[in-house]
Amino acid sequence: MEHNTDISTTQYNSHTVSTTTLSSFLVNVVTSSKRGNKMTTITAQPPRDEVEPAVPAPQLLSSDSASELSPKAEKFQPGWRFIAAFLSLCIIVLMAALDATSISVALPSMARALGGSAIEAFWAGTSFLLTSTIFQPVLGSFSHIFGRKSLIYISLVFFLAGSIIPAVANNFTTILVGRSIQGVGGGGIIALTEMVVVDTVPLRERGKWFSFFGMMWSFGTVAGPLIGGAFAQKVSWRWVFWINLPFLGIGTVLITVFLKLNQRHGEFLARLREVDWIGMVLFLGSTTGFLIPITWGGVQYPWDSWRTLVPLIVSAAGIVAFIVHQEKFAPHPLIRTSVFKNKSAALLYLTTVIHGIILWAILYFMPLYFEAVKGMGPIMAGVALFPWTFTVAPGAVATGIAIAVTGKYRWANWAGWFLATLGSGLLILLKPDTSTPAWIFLNLVGGIGTGILFPAMALAVQASASVKDQAYAANMFSFFRAFGQTLGVAIGGVVFQNQMKAKLLTYPLLADMADTYSKDAAGLVEIIKGMPAGLMKDQLKESYTDALKYIWIVATVLAGVSLVATLFIDEFDMDIEMDTERGFKEKSKVKDAEKETH
C-alpha cells in the first residue's frame, strides 16, 4: 500500500489512539486473585530459582479443609497513609488515561500544522501502544530487583520526557520519538501501579481497590477527548502534552511523601548482575519484530509483502530462543515460566489474549460504523461508544466487590464470557438503518460482559499462581491483554479487507474500486462522507456494514471459545495470607530471612 499523504485520513490514527485509552482503562481495572475451593489437590511447579525456597502451589480445597491447610489472611484495615498513597497512584493513572484519549481528537490538527501524512499520524498513536506493551514485562522484572517505587519514578521520567518532546516538536518524526518514549512510561505506570496493589492488598480485597483505577480510566476516557478537542480548537494542540506536567508534579510529590514500601537491600552492582540482559534483548527484539509487522500489515504494506512476512518469521524464531533461554540458561529469568505451568493459568492467559483481541477490534471498528454508516463526526462517534465505556467500569466495580464478598471468581468468568459472547453476537444485527435506541441496546450487553471480565480474569490469574509469583502473574496478565489488543486491530483489518472486497465485487457500480476501497477501513470513512446521496453511497454503506458484520462474527466465535475454556478453570482459595517483602511499611509483614532474587 502506497503512503497516502491525504491529511483527512489521519482519522485512522484518531481511532487507534482513542481505543488505546479505552483499552488502557480496561487494562487498569484489572488485577487481583489467589486460591479457591474444590475437592481435589494439585501441585504446580515451583520457581526454578535455587536461592528462593520453593513455594507451595495453590491448592484446590473444600471450604472446610481450606481453613485447616492454608494460613488465612487477616482482615485488611488500611490506614490514612495507605489511602493517601493509593490516591497518589490514582493521580498518575488518571494522567495516563487523559493523555491516551486526548491526543486522538488532536491528531488531525497536529497533522495539518506539521504537514504530516496519514501514515505518520497512524504511527504517532500506534508507537505508544507498541512500546507500552513490550516494556511492561521488562519494567516489571526490573521492579522485582530494584523496587517498585524506583521503577515508578523511572516510568514517570519517561512519561515526562515523552510529554515534552512532542510538545516542542516541529515535525512528526520528533512526535513519533516522543510518543514511543511516552509509551515506555505509560506501560510502566499501568504495570507498576497494579503490582503495588498486589504487594499491599490481600487477594480477596484487591478487586475493590482496582475498581478505583477503573474509575480513573473511565473519567479519562470521557474527559480526554473533550479536553483534547478544546485545546486543539481553542488554544493549541501542544497543550495536549503540556497538561501532563501538573499531574506528573503532583503525583511525584505525593508518591514521594506517602508511598512507603519495604525494599530489598543490597549492592547496586550485585543487583545489576541479577538482570537477565540476554533474555531482555531477546524478548524486546522478538516482540517488537512481531508486533510492528502485525501493526503495519494491510495499512502501510500488504500482508503478503516481504516487509511483513520476514520480520514475523524472524521474530517467531526469536521467541522460541527466548523461551529456551528462560527455561534452560537464565539464572534469573526475565519472566517466571512457573506462572504458566498449571492448567488454569494456561487457559486464563489464552482467554486474556482473546479478551484483548475482541475488545480492541470492537473499540476500533465500532466508531468507524458510526462515522461511515451513520455519518457522525469523531467526537460524536466517541460519544456513541458510551454504551460500552460507561458499562465497563460499573461492571468491573460491581464484580470486584462481589468477588471480595463471595471469595469466588469462576462464576464471574462464566457470566462475563457469556455476556461477551451474547453482546458480540448482537452486533451482527447492526444495519445501515438501525435506530438509535436499537444500537444503544445492542452495545450495552457486550460492555457489561467485558467489564465483568476485567477483575474476574485478573483475580483468577493471580489465584492460580503461588504466593510469591502473584506479582509476576499480574504483570504477565497486563502484557497479554495489551498483546491481544494489538492483534485485535490486525485481525479485524484482515477480515474487513477480505469481506469488503468480496461485497463490493457484487455491485457493478463499485466493482472497479473494490481493491482501493477495501484496503483502508478508516480512510474509506472520508470517501463515503464526501459522496453525494444516491445508490452508490447506499451500496457502499451496505458493503461497509456487511464487512464489519464478519468482524463481529469472529469476535463472537472467539468469545464462545473462551466461554468453553473457562469452564475448565479451577477455583482456588482466595483467603490466603500475604507473603511479600515489598508491602506497605505501615503494616509490614516482611520476612527478612526470605529475600527474593527477582
From Swiss-Prot:
Protein known as: MFS transporter L2
GO cellular component, as recorded: plasma membrane
Gene of this entry: L2
PANTHER family on file: MAJOR FACILITATOR SUPERFAMILY, MAJOR FACILITATOR SUPERFAMILY (MFS) PROFILE DOMAIN-CONTAINING PROTEIN-RELATED
Disulfide bonding pattern of the chain: none
PROSITE patterns: MFS
Transmembrane segments: 83-103, 122-142, 150-170, 183-203, 212-232, 239-259, 277-297, 309-329, 346-366, 383-403, 411-431, 439-459, 476-496, 550-570
Protein's organism: Phoma sp. (strain ATCC 20986 / MF5453)
Glycosylation sites: N171, N342
Gene Ontology molecular function: transmembrane transporter activity
Sequence similarity: Belongs to the major facilitator superfamily.
Secretion signal span: none
Keywords from the named record: Glycoprotein, Membrane, Transmembrane, Transmembrane helix, Transport
Topology within the bilayer: Multi-pass membrane protein
Family annotation (InterPro entries): MFS, MFS_dom, MFS_trans_sf
Subcellular localization, as worded in the UniProt entry: Membrane
